[in-house]
């Protein structure tokens, strides 16, 4: 009798469900996965090495391009590490703005994940729903930085500028008539804070719509329940963080466990799962979006009542205001030297970590006292999460590997760095 052998299959890197450039070598027994071997490095851009030849400010835009779905969160960790080395205190208003935009970014990330995960399971409607709200969030990015994705808005010592008093508005064109423009601009006539406040009031109903589509949908449950189960103990041993860890029942959240900025002033809950399967990871992320919405609302209320500076008043670290540059030679010199030579950071090393939408995102900087880092190390959450892929897929069907990969929430910009 002929011996039946397992066969290998390449999944990706061009597969639409590979979430980037993942090459997954699967060993299959029929349609059952016996081994899953992730091959990474296809998006390696040497970010850590490039940072060694750039000033601290010049490296900031690289952070946006790591996890390019959670841009400002990457900047946040980088700025915190530099500020720890410099020993500076960020103005309280800037801290609130940072926290607010970190939570806006968290919702952006989870909406992208939810839409693409639903799409992977065959529910393309979910993608249309989530991108509807994501458009408003990207407009919030554009209002403060001029960019919808790679904002470079957080700076060492604060943020680039204060929140604007107006919102960009749509204009009639060949593809948009006056009626559609009026509908699109209906909540854009006030300030940015008014626009964000309006979003926080609308969003809970939108989250209800996502749950109506998926939570009790029998096909969605068949694709996710008891798939890719990881216990709490095993999740910690694997180094999983973020929703991957919390879905297994471990209430570990850097915003609560090791609060940074003004998270200790915020009132929010940490959603945790029970069984640690794909379905729990879905429920945790949807609940996280609701909690992020609560935090954003608290930040909006505080920012409305408390004006103030948004960056440190030290022109060796932060650029002077443009109005002053045009009338004061000293401020012009500060600006010129800051953007040509950068600023020197005291010798030492610092690690700063934040609760990134995907888990613990850390930046480790070693300084030799120069204007460039001697060594920059990035701790991406996706790298540890992806390492569990083999264990989570074993014994499941080939189609289930797609859902396991989806609930890991992998973006290869930060995995490959």
From Swiss-Prot:
Keywords: Cell inner membrane, Cell membrane, Membrane, NAD, Quinone, Translocase, Transport, Ubiquinone. Its EC number is 7.1.1.-. It is found in: Cell inner membrane. Gene3D superfamilies: Cytochrome-c3 Hydrogenase, chain B. GO terms for molecular function: NAD binding; NADH:ubiquinone reductase (non-electrogenic) activity; quinone binding. It catalyses: a quinone + NADH + 5 H(+)(in) = a quinol + NAD(+) + 4 H(+)(out). It holds the Pfam family Complex1_49kDa. PROSITE patterns: COMPLEX1_49K. It is a peripheral membrane protein. One of its GO terms (cellular component) is plasma membrane. SUPFAM superfamilies: HydB/Nqo4-like. PANTHER family: NADH DEHYDROGENASE [UBIQUINONE] IRON-SULFUR PROTEIN 2, MITOCHONDRIAL, NADH-UBIQUINONE OXIDOREDUCTASE 49 KDA SUBUNIT. Belongs to the complex I 49 kDa subunit family. NDH-1 is composed of 14 different subunits. Subunits NuoB, C, D, E, F, and G constitute the peripheral sector of the complex. NDH-1 shuttles electrons from NADH, via FMN and iron-sulfur (Fe-S) centers, to quinones in the respiratory chain. The immediate electron acceptor for the enzyme in this species is believed to be ubiquinone. Couples the redox reaction to proton translocation (for every two electrons transferred, four hydrogen ions are translocated across the cytoplasmic membrane), and thus conserves the redox energy in a proton gradient. This is NADH-quinone oxidoreductase subunit D. It comes from Delftia acidovorans (strain DSM 14801 / SPH-1).
């Amino acid at each position: 009798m002929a011996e039946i052998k397992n066969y290998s299959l390449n999944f990706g890197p061009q597969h639409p469900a590979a979430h980037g450039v993942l090459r997954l070598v699967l060993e299959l027994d029929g349609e059952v996965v016996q081994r899953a071997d992730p091959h990474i490095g296809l998006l390696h851009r040497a970010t850590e090495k490039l940072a060694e030849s750039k000033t601290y400010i010049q490296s900031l835009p690289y952070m946006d391009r790591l996890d390019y779905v959670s841009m400002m969160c990457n900047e946040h960790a980088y700025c915190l590490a530099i500020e720890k080395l410099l020993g500076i205190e960020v103005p309280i208003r800037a801290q609130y703005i940072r926290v607010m935009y970190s939570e806006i970014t968290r919702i952006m990330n989870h909406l992208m994940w939810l839409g693409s995960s639903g799409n992977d399971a065959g529910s393309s409607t979910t993608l249309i729903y989530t991108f509807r709200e994501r458009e408003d969030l990207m407009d919030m990015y554009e209002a403060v930085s001029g960019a919808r994705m790679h904002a470079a808005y957080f700076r060492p010592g604060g943020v680039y500028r204060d929140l604007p008093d107006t919102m960009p508005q749509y204009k009639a064109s060949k593809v948009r008539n006056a009626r559609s423009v009026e509908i699109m601009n209906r909540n854009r006539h006030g300030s940015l804070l008014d626009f964000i406040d309006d979003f926080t009031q609308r969003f809970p109903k939108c989250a209800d719509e996502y749950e109506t589509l998926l939570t009790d949908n029998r096909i969605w449950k068949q694709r996710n329940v008891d798939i890719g189960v990881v216990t709490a103990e095993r999740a910690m041993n694997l180094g999983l963080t973020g929703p991957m860890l919390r879905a297994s029942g471990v209430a570990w959240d850097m915003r609560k466990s090791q609060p940074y900025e003004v998270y200790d002033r915020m009132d929010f809950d940490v959603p945790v799962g029970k069984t640690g399967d794909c379905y729990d990871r879905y429920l945790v992320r949807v609940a996280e979006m609701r909690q992020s919405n609560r935090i954003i609302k608290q930040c909006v209320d505080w920012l409305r009542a408390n004006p103030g500076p948004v960056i440190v008043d030290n022109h060796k670290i932060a650029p002077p205001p443009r109005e002053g540059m045009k009338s004061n030679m000293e401020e012009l010199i500060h600006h010129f030297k800051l953007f040509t030579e950068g600023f020197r950071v005291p010798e030492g090393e610092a690690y700063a970590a934040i609760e990134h939408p995907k888990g613990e995102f850390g930046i480790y900087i070693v300084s030799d006292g120069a204007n460039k880092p001697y060594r920059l190390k990035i701790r991406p959450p996706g790298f540890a999460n992806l390492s569990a892929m083999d264990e989570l897929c074993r014994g499941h069907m080939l189609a289930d590997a797609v859902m396991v990969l989806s609930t890991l929430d992998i973006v290869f910009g930060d995995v490959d760095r």
